Amino acid sequence: MVDNINNSDLNRDPITGEPGSHPIGTAVGGMGGAAAGAAIGAIGGPLGMLIGGAIGAIAGGAAGHAAGEAIDPTIEDTYWNDTYSQTTYYKDGYDYTTDYQPAYAVGYANRAKYPAGTTFDSVESDLERSWHEVKGNSRLAWEDAKEAIRDGWDRTDARIAGQEYSPRLRTVDGYAEG
């Protein structure tokens, strides 16, 4: 499944209609990560704090806007909710909201915290720690969650680089890389 950004993904400014409106990303970048993480975390708990901290970790309004372009939690959540059950690592009977949503969020939210070129493998222990902090009621053990976290990380990494991304999807006769 190739990710094509369409008109609905342009985050139009509600006043001007211009694409690329990320008032949260821009404001968060300007205010700083700590305040943003705390504010969003108060609403969304540990998972909200993770996402808010990732967006706020990049200092400055312009950098915050760039982070907002790469990580739009609404777009990521919709994408993964539509895709998770088609992946090679999907476990029958596990649902998106409880089991997989926190895993994808660990991947995409944490990617923004590291410099370009940082690999998943080089920060895997940090990601595992983050998983245990935000997993909530997810039934996924680290080894199972790791694949979804990697997909969230890799998709965000590709979006930052302006590249297309395809997760590992099931095929009719087995499994194949996406």
Please state what every model-predicted region is:
Residues M1-G178:
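Intrinsically disordered, low-complexity, hydrophilic segments
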